[in-house]
From Swiss-Prot:
Function as written in the Swiss-Prot or TrEMBL entry: Involved in erythromycin resistance.
Source organism phylogeny: Bacteria, Bacillati, Bacillota, Bacilli, Bacillales
A Pfam match: RrnaAD
UniProt protein name: rRNA adenine N-6-methyltransferase
InterPro entries per record: KsgA/Erm, rRNA_Ade_diMease-like_C, rRNA_Ade_Mease_Trfase_CS, rRNA_Ade_methylase_Trfase_N, SAM-dependent_MTases_sf
Record-linked PANTHER family: DIMETHYLADENOSINE TRANSFERASE (PTHR11727), DIMETHYLADENOSINE TRANSFERASE-RELATED (PTHR11727:SF7)
């Protein structure tokens, strides 16, 4: 029986035309691809989502390990190749669609992908902005600079802080540009994302916490006492300092996730609701 693709019914790509985003670099090193699949530690019980499947270098290996593979690709030429390569794998579904227009699986799922660099941040937001989703863990190859921003101990960005309240994000190792075709201008990194078993906050608090994070990280280099004084009274700040075991000069961008949980819980317990900072509305892809 001929396998059906789930076609994105939008603008069709002409022969020789590439997708409307740039930054897709295909991996050609078999050992590297095997390492990615091995590090993902997937089993027959897993549903795997691959974002930007390309010509299927990862897809075919994932098909042999996972119970279900959802391979997303927007390039018509690559979709044809993927369909042919996975014809003998009924557990693999090719989704012909723009990555940013898909609906995430409702069940628990794992992400194993070499993602297009140009949409790294939108992809991370899609996966991590809703900690109540089914996303459990992932091994994602991305541009090294982005990987370092997402894993830095000094946190400048409110979204990165919010993600890390519910997910552990770490660099497994760096990857040279020579392992890709066409080779990117910069090196890459293999990033592991894992849902925290004991997150310091309930996922229902995500939006409220993001508002706090945006307010406090307007100036990440600011001292703790300056960054939060618009929310807490002097007496509450004194209580916080004792709870966190820090002084007034502690830089707000260096606080840990557990310390942020204490700050958030103190706010929800002692600060009137109308004084809670609200999360700003952003356009898709902004961070």
């Amino acid at each position: 029986m001929k396998k059906k693709n789930h076609k994105y019914r939008g603008k069709k790509l002409n022969r020789g035309e590439y997708p409307n985003f740039s930054g897709q670099h295909l991996m050609h090193n078999k050992k590297l691809i095997e390492e990615i699949v091995d590090r993902a530690n997937i089993s027959i019980d897993d549903t795997v989502l691959e974002l930007g499947a390309g010509k299927g270098a990862l897809t075919t290996m994932l098909s042999q390990k996972a119970g279900k593979v959802l391979a997303v690709e927007n390039d018509s030429k690559f979709v044809a190749i993927l369909t042919r390569k996975t014809a003998q794998h009924p557990n693999t579904k090719i989704i012909h669609q723009d990555i940013m227009k898909i609906h995430l699986p409702k069940e628990k799922f794992v992400v194993v992908s070499n993602i297009p660099y140009a949409i790294t941040t939108p992809i991370m937001k899609m996966l991590l902005n809703n900690p109540a989703s089914g996303f459990q863990k992932g091994i994602i190859v991305m541009e090294k600079g982005a990987a370092k921003r997402f894993t830095s101990k000094f946190i400048k960005n409110s979204y990165v802080l919010a993600w890390r309240m519910w997910f552990d994000i770490g660099i497994v190792r760096e990857i040279s540009k020579e392992h890709f075709s066409p080779p990117p201008k910069v090196d890459s990194a293999m990033v592991r994302i894992t849902r925290k078993k004991d997150a310091p906050l309930s996922h229902k608090h995500y939006i409220a916490f993001l508002g706090l994070a945006e307010y406090a990280l307007k100036e990440p280099q600011a001292p703790f006492c300056v960054a939060l004084r618009g929310i807490f009274t002097p007496r509450q700040m004194k209580h916080l300092r004792k709870s966190l075991k820090i002084n007034n000069e502690k830089t707000v961008g260096t606080l840990t996730e557990n310390q942020w949980a204490v700050i958030f819980n103190t706010m929800t317990q002692y600060v009137m609701h109308h004084k809670w900072p609200r999360a700003n509305k952003r356009k898709p892809g902004e961070i």
